[in-house]
Amino acid sequence: MEFFRFINALLGFPEEERKKKQSSGGTHNEHKPEQQTNAQHPSPQPIHHTPPSHSSETNNEHKPTPTPIRPAPPPPPPIIRHLKTHGSGSTTTHNEHESTPPSHYIRPMPIEHEPTPSPQPVTHNSSTNNEHESTPLPTPTPPNSGNEHKSTSAPTPPGLHRTPLPTPPIHHGIPTQIPPKREPEHHTHGSTNNEHESKRSPIPTPPGLHRIPTPTPPTHQTSPSHSSGGTHNEHESHPPTLHIPPSHHIRPMPIPPNPPIVREPTPTPQPTPIPTPPRLHRIPTPTPPRTPQPTPPPTHGSSSTNSSGSTNNEHKPTPKPIPIPPTPPPPPPHHGIPTQIPPKHESEHHDHGSSSTNSSSSTSNSSSGGTNNEHESTPSPQPMPIEHKPEQQTNAQNRITPIINLSQTKQKTTEKQTSCTIQNLEYAIQIGNLTQAKKILNNLSSNGQISQTKVNMANTVIEGLTKLKMQNQPISNVLSNLTNSFQQMYQNYIRTGKMPDNLIELANVINAITSLLPQYSASVPPNVKAEISRLTVLQQGGSTGTVPAVFFQATEEQRPVSNLIVQ
């Protein structure tokens, strides 16, 4: 007892606690509830080895008598100290527990012999002590006999349990938090993480550690926490410290915003491609039609200066005024329409001014890349096309229109020339187009392109057919009808001696058609031709001897020839 008082005095324990320890054999249990309360927060990860450890403590509570055995083993305290030093890294907690460990170490000696450590529900009370009890767990893993034979090893775990409890919530809390994060699949350890977080809420690192350590040390801590209860946990307390810095290093990696670096290049290329396409579209339109380039230097030296200035403007991307590009688009319709038309017609005269401007601007654009040359070169061609292009258009139209008029007049004249021919007249008569034939006949007679005899024959044909109402009929049909009617009328004239009114007209029409269109003379029978010739002689008042048929008719009809001729 004096030895313990001396140790307590050295360690700074008050005598009241010592008396309490002496009075109650469950001093080991007194500290255990504290450990339980402290440990309940860390992580209730019930390792399967915990039940055997509790029975000894519960038995210790009921049996405080084994206190007299305390003085027997004074040497173990240094062993406990070494174990404690290995288990935890804080000296203050060692001093607190070093006073108690001898008592604990002594107490479990008889306690374990008497009750044969049945399941120790110490972990049930301090279910979270799995972190700290990880070391004793290997001893209880053998059945109860293991604890009986190793009485010294059994007491050490309680000491180990006590010493790490104050400090480990920092060290062990981290690993315990880490493995449950490694094992979100089971979801049983989530509550333990919350308990540890409640204790370590003031520590800023664990929240980051909860996020990051999940990927980093799964292999190290998941396997030991489940494979073996104790020694691995002690060693795990150290690896977490090793794993913590990587977590800190890992955290800053996502934190630095890389997106701004990606965003910076993206805006820069956008302005450059936007202006380029309009330039490409604008520049080629003026350049191809305007080939003459010798004139530009004298006419527009300013464009050459613009080319030199434009190179300076290239280095100044800021002067790219977007409001200016909209202004050039309206002229392009003016550029496009006139530029295509005038170079074909008036490139020699009127385009030299505008072409020189455009050619110089195109050369300047080609030399300088055309960043701002658009704005420099476009203003020069804009006024020029307005001045020249309308004139060019009007001139071109004036030139085009007279050509069309000439062609029309030529066509008209050719139609007149072709139409005013005897062949056309004959064709019109053949098809029965008497009106057109009349017009052609008048033109031919006025121009003197036809003989008077043909004019008379054509007139007789046209007038006779119109009078007989045989218009718009082919001449072949007309002849057949005329010959038939003439024969009938002529027979009647011979029988009666009375000449029909239309007989001579029919004879004249048939005679005119055959004379005007000799190809149709074969369609007229020869007797009809003879009869027609007789009638024509009688009509002309020829002598009696000239027309023998008349005498025959007179003798046949017994009428005087004079009467026949008169009729």
Swiss-Prot record:
Gene Ontology cellular-component annotations:
virion component
Subcellular location field: Virion
Signal peptide boundaries: none
Tree of life domain: Viruses
- Where is the sequence biased in composition, kind Basic and acidic residues? 180-200, 343-353
- Positions with biased composition (Low complexity): 219-231, 300-312, 354-372
Annotated region (Disordered) at: 7-393
Residue stretches of biased makeup (Pro residues): 65-79, 253-278, 285-299, 319-335
Keywords carried by this UniProt record = Virion
For this entry, the protein name equals Structural protein ORF567
